[in-house]
Every structure is written in C-alpha cells, then in structure tokens.
Amino acid sequence: TGIYMSLCIRPNISLEKASMITLITAMAICDAIEELYNISPLIKWPNDIVINSKKICGILTEMSCDMDGIKYIISGVGINVYDTEFPDDIKDTASSLLLETGTKKDRAKMISSAIYHFYEDLDTFMQTEDMSALKSKYESRLANIGREVMILDPKGEYPATALGIDETGALLVNANGKIKRVISGEV
C-alpha cells in the first residue's frame, strides 16, 4: 500500500554536505507527487512531506564514510500511497495520497518520477555543492515558512518564526529578534 525505497549514491562531496541530500530527496518526492496527482505537497523541514498538514512521507538519510571521505549515502523514503487506516496515536497527523487526493495512481510511475527529479536536482546541487541554486525551489515547498514553529533543541525548546534555509540547508528562524540556524532537532 506504500512505497518504500532507498536511493544509494556515491557523491564526491565532503561530510558536512551530506545532510543536503535529504533536502534534495524531499524536493524530488514533492515534484513526483505534484506531477502525478496535480497537488502541491509541502516539506516540513528537513525530512517530512505533508499534504493538508498531514504527513504522507518520511525520509531518513544515512551514510558510510572512512578516513578518505564518504563511501556512500542512502536516502530511505517511505510514502503512504494507498493506506486508508492509521494507528490511533498518529491518525490525526498522518495520511496517504489516496486519502488526500481521492485517486489511485501507479506506484511505478511515482518511483520513476521521483528518481528522475532526484537526479535532476542532484546534478544542480553538484555544480555548487550547496543549496544555493536550489534554495528558492526548496523554500517554495517549505511548509512552515513565515509561521511560528517550536524548535525542539537538545538545550530546550523555543518558539521561532521560520524564515527559510541557507545555502547549507540549515533552517533559518527568527527567535526573539535573533536570526538562528537550526541544523538538527525537531521542528
């Protein structure tokens, strides 16, 4: 009832740039959904895809590296496609493409489209090895841009307004008049 896939790449990039692959994957999934379903999903930074404020996709990116650098990066994707029921603890926050659009589409076409868009954006990313050329595209999909969000930081949570991302993919927020970069944690 879903799509569960992993994209494995061996990019020649430095370790600190690996997290941006999650953002590229998220944009590719959004592009594929929009192409097939004619609906505009949004990204809840950095790794969730939402439609009507409900999560329909999660992304987990991991890598293997050694002293010479990155050996490979794997971006795992789980998309709720045909699901119609969810456990009680997530039924108010999770959904599927079928529930949100009322239509069934071919999962193979979704996978093909996602892979196409992934490599298209990866090529753009590799030209600068940062998000500068993809920043406006990503921000156009950012679910909470201009809205107050709660940053769940290891040092404690705090409210802030989401402003966008920087060239490294960090979330930029305004917290009490100070611009902060969020590089990890939950939003």
Predicted regions and their residues:
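DPxDG-like acidic metal-binding loop motif
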Residues: T1-N12, I21-T25
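Long, positively charged amphipathic alpha-helical accessory segments at protein N-termini or as interdomain linkers
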Residues: I13-L15, L23-P41, I51-V187
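Conserved active-site carboxylates
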Residues: D48
